[in-house]
Amino acid sequence: PYLGQLPSGETVLSYESSSKYTLKIGDATARNFGSAYQPFSGGYWGSFCIIDSHTLVGTNIKAKEGPVQMAQFVLNHRIDAVKRKVTIDGNNKEWANTDHALFVGSKSQAQGTLRCSYDDDNIYFLLEVLDRNLLASDYASLYVSPVSNNKLSKGACCIQVTMNGLKNCEIYDASWKEAQLDAQVKTYVCNETNERLIDDYGYIAEIAIPRSKLTITSGQVLVNFSITKRNSLDAICDVASTSTARWIPAVSYTHLRA
């Protein structure tokens, strides 16, 4: 077995179980661990290396004298919102690389990150989508929920964006219903016609949601994030479920006062 600890405190354990490489995430004392994750089909003698605060690389030998399997894994956990004024123009210049981010992108070449900021009037979100085959029908969905009893409740909202801008806004009231949130959305497509590329191609989306439209409790909201490409959906948490138990807290050190 291999055991490591990320800077944020989470411990990572890797071991072989029934000839499968297995990972578990544990608490800071390495005493309590979550469910097992088995990313490779089989093999033996696996190990991992922590790359940075949110990334590790796991390796495993497929079979005797076979190829080495290797994969990168990204940790999604609570993100801290930075207080700043953001101009909604599709330019990410106000945002810093050190901002906490959530990551989606295990099912296809399309990947996305989500960051959060706020000021006295709005909560801001930055979506950066890397996609080398971007289609007008592809979209990203941002879900925001009050901190409640682990269930979707009135006050939750969903904003969908494409590379061309706002696609749809919905609020939750027993079911998802189209609504006006007064959200501002601006996108910027990154391709061979400009210099602001995200690695190769993709788009940037900046979103501002008025604080008056959200229910903020003790400086927190819960967020979920998904990207949809050619009807294939990749998300942090199951978007069809009404449970928010695994949604990610977005937290302000100074509290996002409602």
Language-model segments: which ranges?
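Hydrophobic strand positions within the blades of repeat-based beta-sheet folds
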Residues: 3, 13-14
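Structural signature of eukaryotic scaffold interfaces centered on beta-propeller domains
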Residues: 3-7, 48-51
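Entry beta-strands of beta-propeller and related beta-repeat scaffolds
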Residues: 9-13, 54-58
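Structural motif
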Residues: 18-25, 64-72
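Conserved blade-ending motifs and adjacent loop-strand segments that build the rim/top face
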Residues: 32-49
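Acidic/polar low-complexity flexible segments
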Residues: 45, 66, 71-91, 98, ...
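Short, well-ordered beta-strand segments enriched in hydrophobic/aromatic residues
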Residues: 90, 122-129, 205-209
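Glycine-aromatic-enriched beta-strand/loop faces of beta-sandwich-type recognition domains
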Residues: 154-200
